[in-house]
From Swiss-Prot:
Family matches, as SMART domains: EFh (SM00054)
Keywords tagged on the record: Allergen, Calcium, Metal-binding, Muscle protein, Repeat
More info: Is regarded as an important allergen.
Residue span(s) of domain EF-hand: 4-39, 43-74
Name this polypeptide is given: Parvalbumin beta 3
Keyword Metal-binding in record: yes
Annotated residues for binding of Ca(2+) 2: D56, D58, D60, M62, E67
Entry GO CC: cytoplasm
Coiled coil: none
Molecular function terms, GO-annotated: calcium ion binding
InterPro entries in alphabetical order: EF-hand-dom_pair (IPR011992), EF_Hand_1_Ca_BS (IPR018247), EF_hand_dom (IPR002048), Parvalbumin (IPR008080)
Amino acid sequence: TFFKSNDDVKKAFFVIDQDKSGFIEEDELKLFLQNFSAGARALTAGETKTFLAAGDSDGDGMIGVDEFQALVKA
């Protein structure tokens, strides 16, 4: 896998979590996905919500560090 350890996953999480809230919110996820690849197009609001929902296992509208770990290790 891309991430070698849980520490790598946590480091990635905290890079995406721009406001250091402990959660990845929709705007942070959208910014990360847009910047992930130089040629990436902007995602629609619906696409961003779909990505967010895929990782948001507790339905609070945000991705916590545990949810992020589960998402990237899946």
